[in-house]
Design a protein with these regions (language model features):
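Broad phosphate/nucleotide-binding scaffolds in NTP-utilizing and phosphate-metabolizing enzymes
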Residues: 1-246, 251, 259, 263-283, ...
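Histidine-centered phosphotransfer motif of kinases
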Residues: 254
């Protein structure tokens, strides 16, 4: 059944390493590339990943902070007095595991609950090797499919943007490995959206952090899957408003806002996590997004189509295909954008939820 297929797919991807997991997380938000069923299956990669060994994590902490041994991480780990340990306590199992690291719950000597993110051993080397393998294999696949299409007299092979997805993910992964950069990104993101009043970021503890170990305050809250329908709708609304403000007002965007990187805190604020992937938005793109939102609210689909083209959602000149299995072709007609606007209007009117607040267009 679908659940079994999804579990099998996720297990296979997790076994291929962090680059595969990150590509899977990215594709979980692209039903246009992999289909709805695959997207649903891949979503579990956002919050459920295979952890690496606790011994390796403790060893990384000991090395990063130049401790005598892993026993000096916390009293409950090695039985040493608290005065000889980095933390007052440190969980024996990870609270969460991600593609490049895992998080432990700890307590500082001044009694603060904190989250300690420890990078996977040899993460940089693994990412570099995985990406190289991906790039080489994908090039071979592209050439083989192009050759097969040429033999059949068909048009050029359309890679469906998968190659671009892999390149983008790999670039971002190298940034994610720099925890110093992530801490700076988090502070900048908090400051950029402070005016909203309902967005927060975990406070960074520099004295307990390094380039490969990141310590922040422990967030008391829940991810979307653990929330009630009412609270889930609230978090979704707050997250959408925050992301929209980033796109059209601040120009500083969290580039990986999937379910695993969002929490609703007990005080009702939405908390963003994981700031390894960030992006800056040019002013003209911000203006085009704003125009697109205004056009959508006014149901002005001609202006919305132009905004799509301005931000790059549509190519110039237009390209189209009848179905996902066909290659894109140039839509070489003088009224191509008007026809697209007409089809967009029809789709929004006939698709279930098409004109609702979080409907088909979202």
């Amino acid at each position: 059944d679908q659940r079994t297929r999804g579990a099998t797919l996720n297990a296979a991807i997790a076994g291929l390493g962090p680059v595969s997991v990150k590509v899977g997380q990215t594709l979980s938000q692209r039903p246009d590339l992999v289909g709805e069923e695959a997207c649903e299956a891949l979503k579990s990669l956002q919050t459920k990943n295979r952890p690496f060994s606790n011994a390796a994590a403790l060893q990384s902490v000991a090395v990063e902070f130049k401790l005598n041994s892993t026993a000096n991480v916390a009293p409950n780990i090695g039985g040493l007095p608290a005065s000889q340990c980095l933390f007052a306590s440190f969980s024996e199992e990870p609270a969460a595991a991600a593609s490049l690291g895992q998080v432990y719950k700890a307590r500082t000597h001044d009694n603060r609950e904190v989250a300690v993110k420890v990078q996977r051993p040899d993460a940089l080397r693994t990412v570099a090797i995985d990406y190289t393998c991906f790039a080489v294999v994908w090039k071979l696949i592209e050439r083989w499919w192009s050759f097969q299409r040429k033999l059949k007299g068909e048009g050029p092979f359309d890679n469906g943007d998968i190659g671009d997805v892999v390149d983008t993910v790999a670039d971002g992964l190298f940034d994610e490995l720099d925890y110093d950069l992530e801490a700076l990104n988090a502070d900048k993101f908090r400051e950029s959206l402070d005016f909203l009043g309902f967005v927060d970021v975990p406070t960074f503890l520099p004295e307990l952090s390094t380039n490969r170990v990141l310590t922040t305050e422990w967030i008391r809250g829940a991810h979307l899957e653990a929330l009630s329908v009412k609270d889930g709708a609230l978090m979704t609304q707050l997250a959408v408003e925050a992301c929209t403000a980033s796109l059209v007002l601040t120009g500083y965007v969290h580039a990986d806002p999937h379910e695993g990187n969002l929490m609703l805190r007990e005080d009702g604020k939405v908390v963003f996590l994981d700031f390894g992937l960030m992006s800056g938005v040019d002013g003209y793109i911000m203006e085009s997004f704003a125009q697109g939102i205004r056009a959508c609210l006014a149901e002005d689909y001609e202006s919305l189509a132009r905004a799509f083209q301005d931000v790059g959602f549509l190519t110039t000149p237009l390209q189209f295909r009848e179905n996902p299995k066909q290659a894109y072709e140039l839509y070489d007609t003088p009224n191509g954008l008007d026809q697209f606007a007409s089809e967009l209007r029809e789709a929004m009117a006939t698709t279930e939820g098409g004109t609702s607040r979080f409907g088909a267009l979202a």
